């Protein structure tokens, strides 16, 4: 019959006995045949062939009905997986088609035929195959891959065709997609509900078909609200299985693992490796139950059946004790087999267990489609594959291994059986029956054998109740009262914790190592001697020197008693034996310690950095209050810069600036803008380390709105223009910003570089400068000459005072750039020198080694360059200082070539373009030389000279090497195009001559390896008298080539006038036997033709066209 003839090949090729051996559905990608997989299925090749031949012979005996043919396509990955191939879709479909065509009760009015459509394992290929057979079949059996089921259903609905698939789910009521089996998720859910297991993981094979199956299964389980702890796919080999086992170990409370892959009982290697790994990792000790997914799709034989794979593999047999196999139930004797045997269509000794399990699923799908088509024709719809799902109602017919029962809603109601092993035998024992119509699991009397003796613990029943919200296995309504009580207790505890914390904070202000409030008893106030320095304009930013010109010793000699009366006249004190500085508030102003103020003070107290003065506490007295700060004896940066007796070189300045940048960067990283940064607020300690002070002072005043007079214009010279233009506060300009600090840093950079006050070069008053800065244009900035510091530092300074705040760099950027300017020097000058000396002494040996390696590297580079310019032997002699003696070579072949029209091309091109195209051309030629035994002598302009047989003699191979090279160069030259003039061809001509010559080095400066002798002149004459795209060969070279008998193709040119030689017989080298590259076609030139003028005119025309296009 036609169906049998199309059973193996999708395009209708004959399937006869000889084709069976190479039929792709029966043979995997590695040549794995049914004989090699007899552990998976006991189908014998001989029985299958015998069965197929009998069916074919039987079909030939049927009369040929003159009826219309209804062709169905069987979709599946039959050609990419040996296990899928074992389903034998052609045999299964043929058996069902024969039954349908011979069933008198089915009045189809048409002849049922089929085509096998292999789709591959990946979803895109499968969908493409499906679309390609739109017009070749009337309905489809499949898809097997659920990944393209939605797309296939939509396309089939538009085409007016139906899909009968056991792997795709569909809404009730039929339509384009007709499921031949119930939802696999519902089947698994019924089993899980029976055993009380809700927490699951899904592990799939790496194949696209199984990954998609796992994803859709997870979606279905999530729709039921089940907790999925893991969805993953196996990697290659044991390593991938081990990784999955580790992931399963990490999932808490896991009960079941659904395995979306081929069953180990059917030869599934991935499931076998995974189960062995699970046993090795201790996952098969009873804590988990493994459920294979693929066995849900077919009836797995189990009656009087032993699986050799369990007998032959002890670890797998032990691991399979943790597996529950759910499969369609099978009857003792299939009606399909009974009918076939009665009519002699199969061997008498062939039983149902010898058929691959998916075989029966395909068979049942065809039977179901035939009955739907029969019902459709009976109701007058006609022979059509559309809406067949609407014609499957209340059906009860014999299937392959059990009866096919369809209820009134079109749902199939098969019976599933749960199979188990005891970990020792190789047989599957039925323990439960699942009735799909009631979704109830009934025991059969044999208990499930769980490893360890007991099943995994049951999960909360709320997971399976659709009317109950289940959160982590707990019903929220039952715990609502507990949650309410917990919240109330938490609120009460929170209030108690707040008040306790508030009390502890108040206590921490006065006690402990991190206390903030200091008492007069903790400070020793010292009377200051009269100052001989000029007073500072900013009373709140006084110099940090101990006595403004005195020393600590003079202060101690003046007074060592605690005299509170001196407090109004001093800014220094002793605290815990260390000097401290008092940053006083305005007279009569007592700070209000609000929560915001205390938070700011605690933040300041916690700040510790080498370049930020430490805040030690707050002193609140009856008349005077002050911040207690770390003391720096060398005064402010402004004092240091104004001291003309102190010499400051760049190293010193860079050290101070780097300290300033580090301190400000630290404040910004702590989200603490300064707001009042100036050279007076930068102090220097005895080690010449610069520290930033007065940080937080403005914020503290703002936190409790303390009054302070407006600062003088001289105090605003460091202020950013946007702050000057902003709303004024009672104590100064606008709120502190990070970008405002960057501007102030730029002004300090100008002070350090010039050692002059800000904007000193303008010669204007501070008030006028502030007005110009706040109201540009013109832009008013300090002027710094290039000789007052490194150019990079001046450029960085100018970036810092950009008008737009967003254009100014961040402190991280400033720090990185300044480190590069300062070459990574440390902050302290003395420390930097000591560290430098120590580093130098420690790294001297490494430095010597590094320089030695660099010298060796340069030596190698020099030798490599010398060897590229001269032969290795000559280069070695020159390097050793020995004389290079000229050498006579009795037989060499020399190659000359040039570019026809090069002079015209050079005249019409820019010099840089000429160099570029010559470099491209000669680079291509040089690449050809690498594969031949030749030596490149030189290139002069467009002339290219190569020789073979020197400096290394190669016997009589010199002519062949040059000839092969010349042919290859000519082949590449024919396709070469100039980058600046791609439409202008490059025509190369070459000349070859063989003979003796002398080679030697000429000169001491830029020595050259030169060739001398008449052979060189003759080769040059051969090139100059040649023609474009031609290889001009002398008689000597021709004789050398013919003596080698390598199949060179040589044409006689005739007598040619050679300068200094007269007329000589010359030849053209046109090819070689076995040379496969194409050669450019030479110009047809007759004697006396002005071919050079024609070529030059062609070049000019090409450049003119290029100029017009440009």
UniProtKB/Swiss-Prot annotation:
The keyword Disulfide bond applies. Its main location: membrane. The chain crosses the membrane at residues 476-500. SUPFAM superfamilies: Nucleotide cyclase, Periplasmic binding protein-like I, Protein kinase-like (PK-like). Its EC number is 4.6.1.2. One of its GO terms (molecular function) is peptide receptor activity. Pfam families: ANF_receptor, Guanylate_cyc, PK_Tyr_Ser-Thr. Residues 1-66 form the signal peptide. Specifically expressed in a subpopulation of olfactory sensory neurons. Expressed in the cilia of the olfactory epithelium. It is a single-pass type I membrane protein. This is Guanylate cyclase 2D. It comes from Rattus norvegicus. The gene is Gucy2d.
């Amino acid at each position: 019959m036609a169906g049998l003839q199309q059973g193996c090949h999708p395009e209708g090729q004959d399937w006869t006995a000889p084709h069976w051996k190479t039929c792709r559905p029966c043979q995997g990608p590695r040549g794995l045949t049914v004989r090699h997989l007899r552990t998976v299925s006991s189908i014998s090749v001989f029985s299958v062939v015998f069965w197929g031949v009998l069916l074919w012979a039987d079909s030939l005996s049927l009369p040929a009905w003159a009826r219309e043919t209804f062709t169905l396509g069987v979709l599946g990955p039959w050609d990419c997986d040996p296990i899928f191939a074992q389903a034998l879709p052609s045999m299964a479909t043929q058996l069902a088609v024969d039954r349908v065509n011979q069933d008198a009760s089915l009045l189809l009015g048409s002849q049922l035929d089929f085509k096998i459509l292999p789709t591959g394992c990946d979803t895109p290929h499968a969908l493409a195959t499906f679309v390609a057979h739109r017009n070749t079949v009337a309905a489809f059996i499949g898809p097997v891959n659920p990944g393209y089921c939605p797309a296939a259903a939509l396309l089939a609905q538009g085409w007016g065709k139906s899909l009968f698939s056991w792997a795709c789910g569909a809404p009730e009521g039929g339509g384009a997609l007709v499921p031949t089996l119930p939802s696999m998720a519902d089947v698994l859910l019924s089993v899980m509900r029976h055993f009380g297991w809700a927490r699951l993981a899904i592990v799939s094979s790496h194949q696209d078909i199984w990954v998609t199956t796992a994803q859709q299964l997870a979606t279905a389980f999530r729709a039921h609200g089940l907790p999925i702890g893991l969805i993953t796919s196996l990697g290659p080999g044991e390593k991938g299985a081990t990784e999955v086992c580790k992931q399963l170990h990490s999932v808490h409370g896991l009960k079941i693992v659904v395995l979306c892959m081929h069953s180990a009982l059917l030869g599934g290697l991935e499931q076998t490796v995974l189960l062995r790994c699970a046993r090795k990792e201790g996952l098969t000790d009873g804590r988990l139950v493994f459920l294979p997914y693929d066995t849900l799709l077919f009836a797995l034989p189990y009656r009087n059946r032993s699986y050799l794979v369990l007998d032959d593999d002890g670890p797998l047999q032990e691991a399979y004790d943790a597996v529950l196999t759910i499969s369609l139930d099978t009857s003792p004797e299939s009606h399909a087999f009974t009918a076939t045997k009665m009519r002699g269509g199969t061997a008498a000794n062939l039983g149902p267990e010898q058929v691959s399990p998916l075989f029966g699923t395909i068979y049942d799908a065809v039977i179901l489609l035939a009955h739907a088509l029969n019902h459709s024709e009976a109701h007058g719809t006609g022979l059509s594959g559309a809406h067949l799902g609407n014609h499957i109602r209340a059906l009860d017919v014999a299937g392959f291994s059990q009866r096919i029962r369809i209820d009134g809603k079109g749902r199939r109601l098969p019976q599933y059986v749960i199979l188990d092993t005891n970990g020792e035998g190789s047989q599957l024992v039925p323990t439960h029956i699942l009735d799909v119509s009631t979704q109830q699991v009934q025991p059969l009397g044999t208990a499930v054998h769980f490893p360890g003796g007991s099943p995994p613990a049951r999960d909360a029943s709320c997971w399976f109740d659709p009317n109950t919200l289940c959160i982590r296995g707990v019903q929220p309504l039952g715990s609502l009262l507990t949650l309410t009580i917990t919240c109330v207790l938490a609120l009460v505890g929170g209030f108690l914790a707040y008040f306790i914390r508030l009390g502890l904070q108040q206590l921490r202000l006065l006690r402990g190592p991190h206390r903030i409030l200091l008492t007069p008893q903790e400070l020793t106030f010292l009377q200051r001697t009269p100052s001989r320095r000029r007073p500072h304009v900013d009373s709140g930013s006084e110099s940090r020197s101990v006595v403004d010109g005195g020393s600590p010793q003079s202060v101690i000699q003046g007074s060592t008693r605690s005299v509170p009366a001196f407090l109004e006249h001093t800014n220094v004190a002793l605290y815990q034996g260390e000097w401290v500085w008092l940053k006083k508030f305005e007279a009569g102003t007592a700070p209000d310690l609000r929560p915001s103020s205390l938070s700011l003070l605690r933040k300041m107290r916690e700040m510790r950095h080498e370049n930020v003065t430490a805040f030690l506490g707050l002193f609140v007295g009856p008349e005077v209050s002050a911040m207690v700060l770390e003391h720096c004896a060398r005064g402010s940066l402004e004092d240091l810069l104004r001291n003309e007796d102190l010499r400051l070189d760049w190293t010193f300045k860079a050290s101070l600036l780097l300290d300033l940048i580090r301190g400000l960067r630290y404040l910004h990283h702590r989200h603490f803008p300064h707001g009042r940064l100036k050279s007076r607020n930068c102090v220097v300690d005895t080690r010449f380390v610069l520290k930033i002070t007065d940080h937080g002072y403005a914020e503290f005043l703002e936190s409790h709105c303390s009054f302070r007079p407006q600062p003088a214009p001289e105090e605003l010279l460091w202020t950013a223009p946007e702050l000057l233009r902003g709303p004024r506060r009672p104590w100064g300009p606008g709120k502190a910003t990070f970008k405002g600090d960057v501007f102030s840093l730029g002004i300090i950079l100008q002070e350090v570089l010039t050692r002059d006050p800000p904007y000193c070069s303008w010669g204007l008053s501070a008030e006028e400068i502030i007005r110009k800065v706040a109201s540009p244009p013109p832009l008013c900035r300090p002027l710094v000459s290039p000789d007052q510091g490194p150019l990079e530092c001046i450029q960085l300074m100018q970036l810092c005072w950009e008008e737009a705040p967003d254009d100014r760099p961040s402190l991280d950027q400033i720090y990185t750039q300044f480190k590069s300017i300062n070459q990574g020097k440390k902050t302290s000058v003395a420390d930097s020198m000591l560290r430098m000396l120590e580093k130098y002494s420690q790294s001297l040996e490494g430095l010597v080694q590094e320089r030695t390696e660099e010298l060796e590297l340069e030596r190698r580079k020099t030798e490599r360059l010398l060897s590229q310019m001269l032969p290795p032997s000559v280069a070695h002699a020159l390097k050793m200082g020995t004389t290079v003696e000229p050498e006579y070579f009795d037989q060499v072949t020399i190659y000359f070539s040039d570019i026809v029209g090069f002079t015209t091309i050079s005249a019409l091109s820019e010099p840089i373009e000429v160099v570029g195209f010559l470099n491209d051309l000669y680079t291509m030629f040089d690449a050809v030389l690498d594969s031949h035994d030749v030596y490149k002598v030189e290139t002069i302009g467009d002339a290219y000279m190569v020789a073979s047989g020197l400096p290394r003699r190669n016997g009589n191979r010199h002519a062949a090497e040059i000839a092969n090279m010349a042919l290859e160069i000519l082949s590449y030259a024919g396709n070469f195009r100039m980058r600046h003039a791609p439409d202008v061809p490059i025509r190369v001509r070459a000349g070859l001559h063989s003979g003796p010559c002398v080679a030697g080095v000429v000169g001491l400066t830029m020595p050259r390896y030169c060739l001398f002798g008449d052979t060189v002149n003759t080769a040059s004459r051969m090139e100059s008298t040649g023609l474009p795209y031609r290889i001009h060969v002398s008689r000597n070279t021709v004789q050398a080539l013919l003596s080698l008998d390598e199949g060179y193709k040589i044409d006689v040119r005739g007598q040619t006038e050679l300068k200094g030689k007269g007329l000589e017989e010359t030849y053209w080298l046109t090819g070689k036997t076995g040379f496969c590259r194409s050669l450019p076609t030479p110009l047809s030139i007759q004697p006396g033709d002005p071919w050079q003028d024609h070529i030059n005119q062609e070049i000019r025309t090409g450049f003119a066209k290029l100029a017009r296009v440009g």
